[in-house]
A protein has these predicted regions:
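Active/ligand-binding-proximal structured segments within catalytic/core domains
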Residues: 38, 47-60, 69-72
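Short, charged, low-complexity patches
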Residues: 49-53, 57, 65, 107-111, ...
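Short C-terminal domain-edge/linker segments immediately following a structured domain
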Residues: 10-17, 57-58, 66-72, 90, ...
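Short, glycine/acidic-rich beta->alpha junctions
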Residues: 64, 178
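M16 family metallopeptidases and their MPP-like homologs
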Residues: 34-44, 70-177
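An aromatic/glycine/proline-enriched structural segment found at the starts
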Residues: 1-44, 145-146
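Bilobed periplasmic-binding protein/Venus flytrap-like ligand-binding cleft at the lobe interface
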Residues: 1, 53-63, 113-121
Length: 178
């Protein structure tokens, strides 16, 4: 026989209070290398700003051609590793920049150089070559991810949870509209 479906409970989660000031936490330990993490708030998955933050994180720290790697590792030799990624999903997320300082580099020296890279990104329009390169990488990563049945099923479930399973077919258009 048929099993009747149950009622779907309303998902009501409180939003985190708005952060209005800069916060930092310094932890000192005896470790092989000094690590840093910068976290910036970003919109939830349903917001177009989510996709802009995703592209920005790729421009900043996806690979060896990224802005942070080129400037802070290759040119200035301030870090031994650096990257950027996002944590967003249903709720507001974070764009995180993290890595490890080279020996002898102070956090203040690194911080100044990092903010110079971020200010340049903020104040200058990204050229078409860089944007095209990022879009190709995003499309390629998505196509490889979609080859596996489990990944396709998980992505479909994610979009259904967001309220529109067809969003899986429309997401690439959002990226290309940036």
């Amino acid at each position: 026989g048929e099993i009747p479906s149950g009622s779907k409970p309303a998902r009501v989660l409180e939003a985190e209070p708005e952060q209005k000031e800069f916060r930092e936490k310094l932890i000192e330990r005896n470790v092989p290398a000094d690590a840093f993490y910068y976290a910036f708030k970003m919109p939830e998955r349903k917001n177009a700003g989510y996709y802009m933050a995703d592209v920005l994180s790729d421009a900043l720290g996806r690979d060896k051609s990224s802005r942070l790697y080129a400037s802070l590792k290759k040119e200035q030799k301030l870090v031994s590793e650096i990257g950027a990624y996002i944590t967003g999903s249903l709720d507001n997320g974070l764009l995180i920049i993290g890595g490890k300082l080279n020996e002898g580099v102070s956090f203040n020296m690194f911080d100044k150089a990092l903010w110079e890279v971020l200010e340049k990104l903020k104040n200058e329009i990204m050229d078409d070559t860089e944007l095209d390169r990022l879009m190709i990488k995003i499309r390629t990563a998505r196509e490889f991810q979609e080859q596996g049945l489990l990944n396709r099923a998980m992505n479909l479930c994610q979009f259904e949870l967001l309220g529109d399973a067809n969003g899986i077919n429309e997401e690439h258009e959002i990226y290309y509209s940036i």
